[in-house]
Amino acid sequence: MAALVCGYFIEIGWARRYNLMTRRMDLLGVESKKMTTRRLSTGIPGLDQVTMGGLIPRHAYVLVGNPGTGKTILSLQWLLEGVKCGEKGIFISMVEEPKMLKKNAESLGWDLAPIEITDFSVAAVGDMDEFEEYHVFPSSEVENAPVWKKICEIVEKKKPQRLVIDSITQLRQFSTDEYQFRRHIFVLIRFLTQAGCTAVFSCEPLFMEEDTSISSAVDGIIYLEKEISRERLIDIRNIHIQKFRGSDFLPGAHPMRITSRGVEIFPHIIEKNREVQHAGEQIRSQIPELDNLLGGGIESGTTTIISGPSGTGKSTLALQFLMQAALAEKRAILYSFEETTESILFRSRSVGMEVMPLLEKGLLEIRYVNPLELYPDEFLQAIRLSIGKESYNVAAFDSLNGYHMTMEEFGSTVAHLQNVITYLKAQGTTVFMINETERITGDLRMTEAGISFLADNIILLRYIEQMGRIGRVMGCVKKR
């Protein structure tokens, strides 16, 4: 029966092929069903969120990316997730031999045994010169190309729910010209849809530019990109969806990593402002003069910038607020972009601040963050886990300068920071941000990066010179 069905696909005229194939699939008991809301989970952290639940069954998708962007790893991850869901998966390799695929998968701790891997690489199919001579044959013989026929036979015989062809760039070589390749692709996608199969193809960007018919043939186009950062310090990977027929999706570029666990994606979600009712509580520093200056303290749920030049006590003041919040049984967390936890503990002991008991009780946490190791959206995801799941009431960031200097590799730090603050405000979290200014004396300047609009309160620490001596002063220049 497989040969009969494939005969319709390969041998008869194009005008009749489409109708006869559909009729034949109906005779086989495969009915064309309307799209439902059911989704096929990708098994890739973050991608289901970007695609609003996963891929739509019976649709065809293409992963577009240059070599090394993660197309093969992502495809295998998707097939392995299907195995977990009791779905049969087939991987048709046009490039790598199965033994190399399995070897690379083993480095990720994956067992590809449940996936059927079909080898269509050059070594398996035969000498490419054989196919390069197609132009000398009559068209009727050309359409009997064994690779196209074999794909059809495999799908009909194995009846997979998930299929990957890696890649259609190489599949192009098995058609005599672009026109015939486009016809083959359109019919293949129709055939897979009627067979109840969800397909993922991969190709390179140049191929998509040269053959735009692929864009209209598939239901979804997903781009994987890799570039060097602006200062050429790190690689930046992201994924974005150009087309996703039948569904909404999260727009924009979403950072991704290839880790020892496979592909991980960190969705770029623009947080929305939400009105939060505050209890009217205040967080006090327990420094009488400062609390009087602040009208009793800092209101819960607000954002405060502590700004000033180096050495004025900004970090110590922020830690003082966090300690007092923790002593009042509120959970507090400090994200440090510059100092390690050990350095902060040493400094706090030197000024008589007993931080360790609060750390041991779990009321206070100090978390050192190397911004070069995290994408901004990855950092925000870590904050969501800390604030949302671990229920922190107060958060501090030390410092905005360290955050800005490294996170600017990924784009506008002000936009990313605003996203973080918007999320924290929606959670009712009290936020302290430490900002270092460059000027020691002279003109008054709140911040160097122009972020004062994010703050409800601004505490300014400065140096003054009096009678040949340097002193420190503090003032509250903004309080809502």
Where are these regions (language model features)?
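Short, positively charged and aromatic/hydrophobic N-terminal segments
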Residues: 8, 17-19, 26
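Conserved P-loop NTPase
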Residues: 31-38, 126, 140, 158, ...
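Pre-Walker A adenine-sensing motif
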Residues: 44-54, 287-297
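P-loop NTPase motor core
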Residues: 61, 139-217, 221, 375-454, ...
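Conserved nucleotide-binding/hydrolysis micro-motifs of P-loop NTPases
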Residues: 95-99, 107, 121-125, 169-171, ...
